[in-house]
C-alpha cells in the first residue's frame, strides 16, 4: 500500500533524524520524490541504466513504472551516474550538470577461492566442456534490455570457425525460453548452457 508505506517512511525520517534520502529504481525514485515533498529533505538517486530502456518488452510496465520513473527523476535534487557515459546521457536529456555526479561501480580485487574447480563447476551447471574448450560467460538478468540475443547470435557466428567455443549464461528472467529457442534455431543449443540463477559467482567467474 503506497500511502501506508509513505506514512511509515515519513515517521521514520522524523523519528530517526535522517539528513538525506537516497533511492534508485522506479518505485524507489517515486517514493523519494514523495518523501522530499513531505519532509523537505534533499534527495539523491543513483541511475544504473537508461531509464527509457528499463522496461523493454513489457509495454504495461513501461507505460506505468517507466513514466513514473521519468517524472520522479525530474523531481529529485541530485543524480549519480554509475559511469561517465551515464552522466553524459542524463545531461543530453536536459538534467542539470551541476547536480550530476559520476560514482563508478565498486570492484573488490581481494583474491577469492572458488568453491569448485572449473570441471566440477561446469558439470554442476550442465555445461559440456573439456580442457580444450574456450568458455565465454555472462551473468545477467535475462531481460530484453540486456540483449543477450545479440550475444548468442555472435557466439553462433564465431562457433562456425571455432567449434571448441562454449557459452555459459548465468541468470534468470522472462527471456529464458526465447533465448533457448534462439540457440536451438541457430544450431548451438548444445554449446550454449543456461545455468539459471546462481549464488556461487566466485566459481562462475573463476
What are these regions (language model features)?
Residues 1-206:
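Membrane-interface segments of envelope glycosyltransferases acting on lipid-linked substrates or membrane lipids
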Amino acid at each position: 500500500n503506497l500511502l501506508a508505506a509513505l506514512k511509515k517512511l515519513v515517521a521514520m525520517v522524523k523519528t530517526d533524524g535522517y539528513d538525506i534520502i537516497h533511492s534508485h529504481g522506479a518505485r524507489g525514485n517515486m517514493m523519494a520524490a514523495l518523501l522530499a515533498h513531505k519532509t523537505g529533505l534533499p534527495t539523491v538517486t543513483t541511475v544504473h541504466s537508461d531509464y527509457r530502456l528499463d522496461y523493454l518488452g513489457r509495454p504495461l510496465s513501461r507505460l506505468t513504472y517507466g513514466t513514473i520513473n521519468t517524472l520522479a527523476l525530474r523531481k529529485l535534487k541530485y543524480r549519480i551516474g554509475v559511469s561517465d557515459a551515464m552522466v553524459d546521457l542524463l545531461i543530453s536529456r536536459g538534467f542539470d550538470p551541476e547536480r550530476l555526479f559520476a560514482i563508478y561501480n565498486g570492484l573488490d580485487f581481494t583474491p577469492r577461492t572458488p568453491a569448485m574447480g572449473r570441471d566440477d563447476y561446469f558439470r554442476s551447471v550442465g555445461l559440456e566442456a573439456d580442457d580444450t574448450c574456450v568458455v565465454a560467460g555472462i551473468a545477467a538478468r535475462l531481460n530484453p534490455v540486456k540483449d543477450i540475443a545479440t550475444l548468442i547470435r555472435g557466439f553462433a557466428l564465431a562457433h562456425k570457425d571455432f567449434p571448441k567455443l562454449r557459452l555459459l549464461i548465468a541468470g534468470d528472467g522472462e527471456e529464458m525460453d526465447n533465448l533457448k529457442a534462439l540457440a536451438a534455431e541457430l544450431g548451438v543449443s548444445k554449446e550454449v548452457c543456461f545455468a539459471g540463477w546462481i549464488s556461487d559467482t566466485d566459481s562462475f567467474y573463476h
